[in-house]
Amino acid sequence: MKDKYGREIDYLRISLTDKCNLRCAYCMEKDHNDFIHNDKLMTLDEILRVVKECASIGIKKVRLTGGEPLVREGVVDLIKNINKIPEIEEICLTTNGILLGDKVKELSENGLKRVNISLDTLKEDRFKEITRIGTLDKVLYSIEKCLENNVKVKINTIILEDFNKDEILDLINLAYKNPIDLRFIELMPIGEGKKFKGVTNSEILEIIKKEKKVLSDGKTLRLNGPAKYISIEGFKGKIGFISAMSDCFCEDCNRIRVTPEGFMKQCLHWKYGINLRDKMRNGISDEELREIIKKSIYEKPEKHNFKMKEKDEDKRFMYEIGG
């Protein structure tokens, strides 16, 4: 369905949990352990109910996020049941990759088509530094197993000043021999991210252009999402740029989000939305739930305003909202 600005909203992102098995420095405090109680999370049945009603009004793609979605029990069955909904054309997962390698075969067999894996460095010492407790080999193993099981892979990378800027060319080489898309995502000033200085995608592109033959400039190659892609001579995969800060893409936004506790967010930046979990637990019918979702989608804000401090901005961290 369309929102009031005429944008076709066909993509639902649902966060299964705020829990994570890493503590990435720009996302979560090192000693954080105060997570949403299980009884406050949407149950898997409630999640499935939301997906069904969203599908009935035009949602075609579902992405499961977190936190780290694979720390939530029952993910395989949830994907299996979502895959039975006729209107849903694609089920995707955003993950840090630590637990994915040993689960991807079963996930794929039950309907998972794509994964986005967060990876900011190819150096073990830096990986430990940024994630605090992670193991790089597990992520690389997960990428390998995804390719073996025909699950399409996108790598999400954040470049930070004075941390991994010198690895840009090494990182894009992941897309050289493999059909992997690597996307550079500009750091957004949410939660712990406000403490770091990110590198703009225009600067990253210039670094790439100095060393590689770019076949397309990315100005028009946008494929059903916020990323603009370039092709590099000899590369099997593409290089993408998600420039939320320097190149606002809100006019093409096609998504709606639901947090772990069932709050349907109209926009990542703003605090507007409605708690679907509470409505369901208060006994509303499927038809009433559908109408609430339709109204929330229709009232989606025109754009974010991350560059300005606003009284109505969402103060929560990314892992609480759903990355």
Curated annotation (Swiss-Prot):
<feature type="binding site">
    <location>
        <position position="67"/>
    </location>
    <ligand>
        <name>S-adenosyl-L-methionine</name>
    </ligand>
</feature>
<dbReference type="Pfam" id="PF13353">
    <property type="entry name" value="Fer4_12"/>
</dbReference>
<dbReference type="InterPro" id="IPR000385">
    <property type="entry name" value="MoaA_NifB_PqqE_Fe-S-bd_CS"/>
</dbReference>
<dbReference type="GO" id="GO:0051539">
    <property type="term" value="F:4 iron, 4 sulfur cluster binding"/>
</dbReference>
<keyword id="KW-0342">GTP-binding</keyword>
<dbReference type="InterPro" id="IPR013483">
    <property type="entry name" value="MoaA"/>
</dbReference>
<keyword id="KW-0547">Nucleotide-binding</keyword>
<comment type="subunit">
    <text>Monomer and homodimer.</text>
</comment>
<dbReference type="InterPro" id="IPR050105">
    <property type="entry name" value="MoCo_biosynth_MoaA/MoaC"/>
</dbReference>
<keyword id="KW-0411">Iron-sulfur</keyword>
<feature type="binding site">
    <location>
        <position position="24"/>
    </location>
    <ligand>
        <name>[4Fe-4S] cluster 1</name>
    </ligand>
</feature>
<dbReference type="GO" id="GO:0061798">
    <property type="term" value="F:GTP 3',8'-cyclase activity"/>
</dbReference>
<dbReference type="InterPro" id="IPR006638">
    <property type="entry name" value="Elp3/MiaA/NifB-like_rSAM"/>
</dbReference>
<feature type="binding site">
    <location>
        <position position="63"/>
    </location>
    <ligand>
        <name>GTP</name>
    </ligand>
</feature>
<dbReference type="GO" id="GO:0046872">
    <property type="term" value="F:metal ion binding"/>
</dbReference>
<feature type="binding site">
    <location>
        <position position="154"/>
    </location>
    <ligand>
        <name>GTP</name>
    </ligand>
</feature>
<keyword id="KW-0004">4Fe-4S</keyword>
<feature type="binding site">
    <location>
        <position position="253"/>
    </location>
    <ligand>
        <name>[4Fe-4S] cluster 2</name>
    </ligand>
</feature>
<dbReference type="GO" id="GO:0005525">
    <property type="term" value="F:GTP binding"/>
</dbReference>
<feature type="binding site">
    <location>
        <position position="94"/>
    </location>
    <ligand>
        <name>GTP</name>
    </ligand>
</feature>
<protein>
    <recommendedName>
        <fullName>GTP 3',8-cyclase</fullName>
        <ecNumber>4.1.99.22</ecNumber>
    </recommendedName>
</protein>
<comment type="similarity">
    <text>Belongs to the radical SAM superfamily. MoaA family.</text>
</comment>
<dbReference type="GO" id="GO:1904047">
    <property type="term" value="F:S-adenosyl-L-methionine binding"/>
</dbReference>
<keyword id="KW-0456">Lyase</keyword>
<feature type="binding site">
    <location>
        <position position="250"/>
    </location>
    <ligand>
        <name>[4Fe-4S] cluster 2</name>
    </ligand>
</feature>
<dbReference type="InterPro" id="IPR013785">
    <property type="entry name" value="Aldolase_TIM"/>
</dbReference>
<feature type="binding site">
    <location>
        <position position="267"/>
    </location>
    <ligand>
        <name>[4Fe-4S] cluster 2</name>
    </ligand>
</feature>
<feature type="binding site">
    <location>
        <position position="188"/>
    </location>
    <ligand>
        <name>S-adenosyl-L-methionine</name>
    </ligand>
</feature>
<dbReference type="Pfam" id="PF04055">
    <property type="entry name" value="Radical_SAM"/>
</dbReference>
<feature type="binding site">
    <location>
        <position position="27"/>
    </location>
    <ligand>
        <name>[4Fe-4S] cluster 1</name>
    </ligand>
</feature>
<feature type="binding site">
    <location>
        <position position="20"/>
    </location>
    <ligand>
        <name>[4Fe-4S] cluster 1</name>
    </ligand>
</feature>
<dbReference type="GO" id="GO:0061799">
    <property type="term" value="F:cyclic pyranopterin monophosphate synthase activity"/>
</dbReference>
<feature type="domain" description="Radical SAM core">
    <location>
        <begin position="4"/>
        <end position="233"/>
    </location>
</feature>
<dbReference type="InterPro" id="IPR010505">
    <property type="entry name" value="MoaA_twitch"/>
</dbReference>
<feature type="binding site">
    <location>
        <position position="13"/>
    </location>
    <ligand>
        <name>GTP</name>
    </ligand>
</feature>
<dbReference type="Pfam" id="PF06463">
    <property type="entry name" value="Mob_synth_C"/>
</dbReference>
<dbReference type="GO" id="GO:0006777">
    <property type="term" value="P:Mo-molybdopterin cofactor biosynthetic process"/>
</dbReference>
<feature type="binding site">
    <location>
        <position position="118"/>
    </location>
    <ligand>
        <name>S-adenosyl-L-methionine</name>
    </ligand>
</feature>
<keyword id="KW-0949">S-adenosyl-L-methionine</keyword>
<feature type="binding site">
    <location>
        <position position="26"/>
    </location>
    <ligand>
        <name>S-adenosyl-L-methionine</name>
    </ligand>
</feature>
<comment type="pathway">
    <text>Cofactor biosynthesis; molybdopterin biosynthesis.</text>
</comment>
<comment type="function">
    <text>Catalyzes the cyclization of GTP to (8S)-3',8-cyclo-7,8-dihydroguanosine 5'-triphosphate.</text>
</comment>
